[in-house]
């Protein structure tokens, strides 16, 4: 597993990357304990972006990353 850390203003965004294990992974958007979480897969790797950044701005970043 790898992690990349981004910063947008005062918000930290963690993107976790791990090898895809099996089966299709559909894009998901969740909110837990004040954090927005987006996950997606490119078929080879699974990605999880986690931040207290608002949903729209986190979505912009994940789209730039290929979600």
Show the residue positions of the predicted features:
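Polar, acidic low-complexity tracts enriched in Ser/Thr/Gln/Glu with frequent Gly/Pro and Thr-Pro motifs
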Residues: 1-67
């Amino acid at each position: 597993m790898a992690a990349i850390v981004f910063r947008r203003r005062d918000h930290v965004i963690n993107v976790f990357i791990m090898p895809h294990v099996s089966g299709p992974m559909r894009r998901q958007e969740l909110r837990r304990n004040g954090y927005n979480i987006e996950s997606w897969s490119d078929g080879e790797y699974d990605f999880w972006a986690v931040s207290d950044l608002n949903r729209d701005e986190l979505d912009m970043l994940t789209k730039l990353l290929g979600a």
